Regions:
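Alpha-helical ds-nucleic-acid-binding substructure associated with the helix-hairpin-helix region
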Residues: 1-34
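Phosphate-backbone recognition surface of nucleic-acid-processing proteins
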Residues: 45-95
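Short helix-capping/linker segments at secondary-structure and domain boundaries
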Residues: 14-21, 50-53, 70-71, 110-118
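A basic, often C-terminal nucleic-acid-binding module that engages the phosphate backbone, implemented
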Residues: 12, 78-142
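A residue-level signal for conserved active-site and pocket-lining positions in enzyme catalytic cores
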Residues: 7, 61, 102
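Alpha-helix N-cap and coil->helix boundary residues
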Residues: 2, 21, 25, 56, ...
C-alpha cells in the first residue's frame, strides 16, 4: 500500500521536474520524490545522463573507500551521503579516473570478496574461518 502511494506521488511530481537541470540539481530534485533516496536518484542521473558529477554509493563502495582511507570511519551512506560523495568525487578527480568507472570497478571487486575476508581486513584479529570439526590427521602410508 505504501509503495503504491509512493509511486502515485512520484508520478505526479515527475511532471513538474526540471529535466534540463544540472546533474546534481536533478539528483537532489529526485530525492524529493516519495521513497527515492540519494543512491537511487544518483543511479538514475548517472545512467540517464552518463554523469560523473554524482556517484552511486553503497556498502561495497563504502568498504573500499574506508580501505583506501578516503572515507572516515563512523560515516554511513544513509546519514552522510553527500559528504562521502564529495570525498569520492575528489578522489576520482585526484587520480584522473572517471567517477563512473571508479565506482563500477570498486563495486565489482568488493562484492566478490567473501565476508570473512572483509571482516579480517576491517579487524586483523578477526578469524577468517571457524572450523566446524576437529582436524583429521591423514596418513599416506601404505
Amino acid at each position: 500500500k505504501q509503495k503504491s502511494a509512493y509511486l502515485a506521488g512520484s508520478m505526479r511530481a515527475l511532471r513538474s521536474l526540471d529535466r534540463e537541470a544540472p546533474d546534481r540539481d536533478l539528483r537532489d530534485a529526485l530525492t524529493a520524490l516519495p521513497g527515492v533516496g540519494p543512491k537511487t536518484a544518483s543511479w538514475v542521473v548517472r545512467n540517464w545522463r552518463d554523469s560523473d558529477c554524482v556517484s552511486i554509493l553503497d556498502i561495497h563502495i563504502l568498504r573500499a573507500g574506508r580501505m583506501l582511507q578516503i572515507f572516515p570511519e563512523g560515516k554511513s551512506v544513509e546519514r552522510h551521503y553527500l559528504e562521502l560523495e564529495a570525498a569520492f568525487l575528489d578522489f576520482a578527480e585526484a587520480i584522473s579516473v572517471k567517477a563512473s568507472i571508479l565506482d563500477s570497478v570498486m563495486w565489482m571487486n568488493m562484492r566478490q570478496i567473501p565476508a570473512a575476508i572483509l571482516r579480517r581486513l576491517a579487524d586483523p584479529s578477526a578469524e577468517v574461518f571457524s572450523p566446524k570439526a576437529e582436524p583429521v590427521q591423514l596418513s599416506l602410508a601404505l
